[in-house]
Curated annotation (Swiss-Prot):
Amino acids binding substrate: W78, N155, N191, Y267, W330
Localization terms from the record: Secreted
Gene designation: manA
Family according to the record: Belongs to the glycosyl hydrolase 5 (cellulase A) family.
PANTHER family: MANNAN ENDO-1,4-BETA-MANNOSIDASE 1 (PTHR31451:SF39), PTHR31451
One Pfam family in the UniProt entry: Cellulase
Protein name as catalogued: Probable mannan endo-1,4-beta-mannosidase A
InterPro entries: Glyco_hydro_5, Glycoside_hydrolase_SF, MAN-like
Residues that carry a glycan: N249, N320
Any single Gene Ontology cellular-component annotation: extracellular region
Length: 373
């Protein structure tokens, strides 16, 4: 078949335009800001560890409908649910570890529940941060691997080759399900990875090799660590969170080329600091991200009471700090078919006065600052 020059040129132009349109679907980081659906700037969101464990699709849809209505753009979810023994019928789990073997549950009470979360989010334009393992024992965590593979020390998770092979098999299984989904904001290595008492080289090498592995599987989506932001010299006051006690070096880890943006959390009540201290914590991480040329995401923050008075100053500081391009409060709450979603004291329920100050007023401030009103 013969093609004229104009026909070929038109085809090539069309392909370039299609590629550009496709690229717009996927969230990205550029300099110190995030871009979502063609908009570059600062974005608000929340956390919901439980949404992937719901068994009623209508409940999942309800959450994303309310998020969209409220202007929340990013939801961080647990992409893991590890067990050492198979639970009773009707209980969702994603992977079972026992006797040196890990088996991924791709059934209706397994990753198909996460499938629906991704599907529902995609329909409503909500972006997801999907996490692969927990530092803590909630929903199995690293210790579920450690126990099944004959280790006793939590930190063996990072060094035991059999554990890391199992972890990577799981990462590949999840990533391969959603490689083409624009609903994925980023893949996240772990929730709050720590290696207490370790040389920072241990976490650094694990983060580097794991993020490189994920990028080989999926070049379209961003990758982040999910750390708390520990181990930072810049603007340090010498308090516990700035130290390297937990084996993390924020600045060095952020510089890894296959890490697209920085993450940091804030829990003054757990860390032995004041609530006011949190403003400096956000500013120091913004400065570190600015120096690295990558955006920071204020990924978790919360208190168990007096939410509006204590958390809104952190939101204002974050919004006005160069280098920080979004924040996700911990955690989202809603009224589901079975009643209220889990409440750990930090939960902000949709439709309440607290939701207005933490979410609606904050989203309005973001839009006003960026001219998105």
């Amino acid at each position: 078949m013969k093609f004229s020059f104009l026909t070929v040129a038109s085809f090539l132009i069309g392909q370039v335009a299609l590629a550009a349109l496709s690229a717009k679907k996927f969230a990205s980081a550029s300099d110190l800001q995030f871009t979502i659906d063609g908009k570059t700037g600062y974005f608000a969101g929340s956390n919901s560890y439980w949404i992937g464990f719901l068994t009623n699709n209508a409940d999942v849809d309800l959450v994303f409908d309310h998020m969209k209505e409220s202007g929340l753009k990013i939801l961080r979810v647990w992409g893991f649910n590890d067990v050492n023994t198979v639970p009773g019928q009707g209980t969702v789990y994603y992977q079972v570890h026992a006797n040196g073997k890990s088996t991924i549950n791709t059934g209706a009470d397994g990753l198909q529940r996460l499938d629906y979360v991704v599907h529902s989010a995609e329909k409503r334009g909500i972006k997801l941060i999907i996490n692969f393992v927990n530092n803590w024992d909630d929903y199995g965590g690293m210790n579920a691997y450690v126990k099944a593979y004959g280790e006793t020390d939590h930190n063996a998770f990072y060094s035991n080759k059999n554990i890391q092979n199992a972890y990577r098999r799981y990462v590949k299984a999840v990533v391969s399900r959603y490689t083409n989904s624009p609903a994925v904001f980023a893949w996240e290595l772990a929730n709050e990875p720590r290696c207490k008492g370790c040389d920072t080289e241990v976490l650094y090498e694990w983060i580097k090799s794991t993020s490189e592995y994920i990028k080989k599987l999926d070049k379209r989506h961003m990758v982040c660590i999910g750390d708390e932001g520990f181990g930072l010299d810049l603007l340090s006051d010498g308090s516990y969170p700035y130290t390297y006690v937990e084996g993390s070096n924020f600045t060095r880890n952020l510089a890894i080329p296959t890490i697209d943006f920085g993450t940091f959390h804030l829990y003054p009540d757990s860390w032995g600091t004041t609530h006011e201290w949190g403003n400096g914590w956000a500013q120091s991480h913004g400065a570190a991200c600015k120096a690295a040329g990558k955006p920071c995401l204020f990924e978790e923050y919360g208190v168990t009471s007096n939410h509006c008075a204590l958390e809104t100053p952190w939101q204002k500081t974050s919004l006005n700090t160069t280098g920080v391009s979004g924040d996700l409060y911990w955690q989202y709450g809603d009224t589901l078919s079975t009643g209220q979603s889990p409440n750990d004291g930090n939960t902000i329920y949709y439709g309440t006065d607290e939701f207005k100050c933490i979410v609606k007023d904050h989203v309005a401030a973001i839009k006003a600052k960026q001219g998105w009103v």
